[in-house]
């Protein structure tokens, strides 16, 4: 996906009721963010958010947080959610965050996340960029710091030679 600077994206994100601002403050208290205290699943690098919006609709008994680090991409997810809500779909079990995934242990306590989704993340194919991959040892260690005892990381890749 080609990233473009979208004027007003940052302001729209800051003003959105669907985006958790200052997520570090919520550490250990994510159950209070949602209407109901339920298992928490996150998607790291959610893109335009379609996958999570579908899950949130199909599984109202699970809370979801979509994590994206690029304003322009997160804005598209917000616009899609607003469009769906205008058409009568309610997502009280879904929020978004604009944050770098390297900060996950500063945002979630150990045992706060039940499942992590990684869908078609940037493969960073060059060897010198291996640490940037969301499936690198460094990132897997971060996930371990926030998952419940038997938590899961589910990922889909488009490049099988990594």
Protein language model regions, located:
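S-adenosyl-L-methionine
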Residues: 1-40, 50-57, 81-110
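Class I SAM-dependent methyltransferase "Motif I" SAM/SAH-binding loop
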Residues: 44-47
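Conserved SAM/SAH-binding beta-strand->alpha-helix loop
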Residues: 70
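A short acidic, Gly/Pro-enriched loop at the edge of an enzyme's catalytic core
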Residues: 106-115, 120
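A short glycine-rich, Lys/Arg-flanked "PGG" loop and its adjoining helix->strand segment in the class I
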Residues: 135-149
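Conserved beta-strand signature within the Rossmann-like core of class I S-adenosyl-L-methionine
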Residues: 149-157
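Conserved small/polar residues in nucleotide/adenosyl-binding loops
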Residues: 161-162
């Amino acid at each position: 996906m080609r990233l473009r600077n979208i004027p007003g994206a940052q302001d729209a994100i800051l003003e959105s009721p669907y985006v958790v601002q200052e997520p570090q403050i919520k550490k250990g208290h994510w159950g209070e963010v949602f209407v109901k205290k339920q298992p928490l699943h996150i998607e790291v690098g959610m893109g335009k958010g379609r996958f999570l919006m579908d899950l949130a609709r199909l599984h109202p008994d699970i809370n979801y947080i979509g994590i994206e680090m690029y304003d322009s991409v997160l804005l598209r997810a917000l616009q899609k959610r607003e469009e769906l809500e205008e058409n009568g779909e309610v997502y009280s079990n879904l929020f978004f965050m604009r944050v770098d995934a390297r900060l996950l242990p500063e945002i979630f306590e150990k045992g706060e996340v039940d499942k992590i989704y990684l869908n078609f993340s940037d493969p960073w194919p060059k060897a010198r960029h291996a640490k940037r991959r969301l499936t690198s040892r460094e990132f897997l260690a971060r996930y371990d710091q926030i998952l419940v005892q038997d938590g899961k990381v589910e990922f889909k890749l488009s490049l099988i030679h990594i």
